[in-house]
A protein has these predicted regions:
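Redox- and metal-dependent alpha/beta enzyme cores, enriched for Fe-S-associated oxidoreductases
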Residues: 2-23, 140-143, 156, 229
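A short acidic, amphipathic alpha-helical/loop segment
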Residues: 2-8, 134, 210-213
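Glycine-rich, acidic loop regions that bind phosphate or pyrophosphate groups
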Residues: 4-5, 17-119, 238
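Thiamine diphosphate
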Residues: 12, 33, 155-239
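Short beta-strand segments
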Residues: 20, 57-59, 87, 148, ...
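Short gly/pro/ser/thr-enriched loop/turn and capping motifs at secondary-structure boundaries
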Residues: 23-28, 63-65, 90-93, 153, ...
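Structural motif
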Residues: 54, 144, 194-196
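Active-site diphosphate/adenylate-binding microenvironment
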Residues: 112-190
C-alpha cells in the first residue's frame, strides 16, 4: 500500500522516487510502482540525484556515502538540495504518505506502473549482464530474492524491474555473509513461495552452513554463487 500512495504522489506532483541503498525489502516487478535504488558509487549517486532541489525523507535518514572516500562528498545530494523529513525512521511513514496524498488531493490519481519487460535470453560468455538477463528470464511470479551478489550483481535491478511481481531483500550493513541465512529465513517464513539466493563467493564462504539447513528443512531455495574467485568488493574499494 505504501508504494501505491507514493506512486500517487509521484504522478500528482511530478516528483521522483528513490529508495535508500540499504533498504531491507522492496516490492518490485511488472504492475507495481518502480522505485530506483540509491546507487552505491558516490559519483553515480550524485548523478542520479543532481536534479533534485528538495528531498523529502520518509522512514529513512539523509543519504550519505557508505565510506568516507578521499576527495568525495559524504552527502549523496547536491549541496543546494533542501532536505525535509515527512516521517522519521521511528514514525508512521505509511500513514504519513496517505495523509499527504489526501491533503494534496492525490487519492484518485492514476499511478504509473512498471510495464512487463524481459531482456532477451542471452547466450555465450557469462558476465554480469548475461547472468542478470538469465535471472530476469527465469524469475517466477511471487519469488523472494535474497541479493548478496555484491560486485557481480550491480546490474540486476535494471534487468529485473519488468519481471513478474516479486520481493527483493537487500543486505543492510557493511558486513557480508547475510544473504544465504536471509534466504533460509525467507523460505521458512513463506513456504509457499520460491526463494532465489544470489551470493558472491566471498560472501558465501562465511555462512555455507545455510545450505545444510535448507536441505535439512527441505526449503524451496535455489542458490546461485557468483564465483569470480577474487573477493572483488575489496579490490573495488581499494581502487
Amino acid at each position: 500500500p505504501s508504494l501505491e500512495w507514493a506512486g500517487k504522489l509521484a504522478s500528482h506532483c511530478g516528483v521522483g522516487l528513490i529508495t535508500e541503498f540499504a533498504a531491507a525489502r522492496t516490492q518490485r516487478g511488472a504492475g507495481r510502482v518502480h522505485v530506483p535504488r540509491m546507487p552505491y558509487v558516490v559519483d553515480v549517486a550524485l548523478s542520479a540525484t543532481k536534479r533534485f532541489k528538495h528531498a523529502i525523507l520518509v522512514n529513512t535518514k539523509t543519504p550519505v556515502a557508505f565510506f568516507a572516500y578521499p576527495n568525495k562528498p559524504s552527502l549523496l545530494l547536491s549541496e543546494d538540495c533542501q532536505i525535509h523529513t515527512l516521517a522519521t525512521v521511528s514514525e508512521e511513514g505509511p500513514q504519513a504518505l496517505v495523509d499527504l496524498a489526501m491533503m494534496l488531493g492525490a487519492e484518485n490519481v492514476e499511478i504509473q506502473r512498471q510495464p512487463p519487460n524481459l531482456p532477451k535470453m542471452p547466450s555465450g560468455k557469462l558476465d554480469s549482464d548475461t547472468i542478470s538477463a538469465v535471472v530476469a528470464n527465469v524469475l517466477p511470479e511471487g519469488a523472494i530474492v535474497s541479493d548478496e551478489s555484491i560486485s557481480m550483481g550491480r546490474n540486476l535491478l535494471d534487468f529485473t524491474k519488468g519481471c513478474p511481481p516479486h520481493d527483493w531483500l537487500f543486505i543492510t550493513g557493511g558486513s557480508i555473509g547475510q544473504g544465504m541465512p536471509l534466504a533460509t529465513g525467507a523460505a521458512v517464513a513463506c513456504r509457499d513461495r520460491p526463494v532465489l539466493s544470489l551470493s558472491g563467493d566471498g560472501s558465501a564462504m562465511y555462512t555455507l552452513q545455510s545450505l545444510w539447513t535448507q536441505a535439512r528443512e527441505q526449503l524451496n531455495v535455489t542458490t546461485v554463487i557468483y564465483a569470480n574467485r577474487s573477493y572483488a568488493i575489496l579490490h573495488g574499494e581499494l581502487r
